[in-house]
């Protein structure tokens, strides 16, 4: 099962095999105010599957030059750290911020690094982390910009000590946001957590054998909360 800020006031079930907890609040740059309680609940998972009993997920975004965005980088440095950026140098032109692959990478890095360092996660290396990629969060029409930001998120998570990182999405949303991922990208070959929508456990198990998002393997399939579990999504292990 997976929970986040929408379940703050909801009763959480017992004896789930494993649980995935959302680190962010309503927006990617906000905290999940119930993180401590939900992590404690997840830690009591019964186990019995190949999945780690407690996992985490964080939200992807790429607002670009949207004036409503609270932050957009103007250099390759974030909080005193200058990560290796294969897209080049993020900077300004005529004193104005620029939407470039390099700046998208640094923005993604800022999200990932903050998720690990300021959201309240102790021992980040102890968990498997997932990046939640959905259309209802900010993203660019150019998939190359979103891929750069996703690579930055992975770099930021790793800089904070995370070791295992997978991708959560649906095939259609992933295609719209990330497009085609080349083998030269650190996105390629990562474990997938696929959202199936309203469905059944039988169909979820069948979806374990469907085409992965970016050359990886499908580790889990999510069934929408509307199927038999109130406000909490159910997840089926594929391993």
Question: What are these regions, as identified by a protein language model?
Answer:
Residues 1-149, 159-160:
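Substrate-binding cleft of extracellular glycoside hydrolase catalytic domains
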Residues 22, 168, 223:
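Conserved residues at the C-terminal ends of beta-strands
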Residues 1-13, 184-239:
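Functionally critical loop-and-helix segments that line ligand-binding/catalytic clefts
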Residues 56-57, 157-179, 190-199:
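Aromatic-lined carbohydrate-recognition surfaces of secreted/lumenal glycan-active proteins
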Residues 64-72, 173-184:
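Glycine-rich, charge-decorated loop segments at or immediately adjacent to ligand/cofactor-binding or catalytic sites
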Residues 77-81, 95, 109-128, 178-217:
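Structural recognition of alpha->loop->beta junctions
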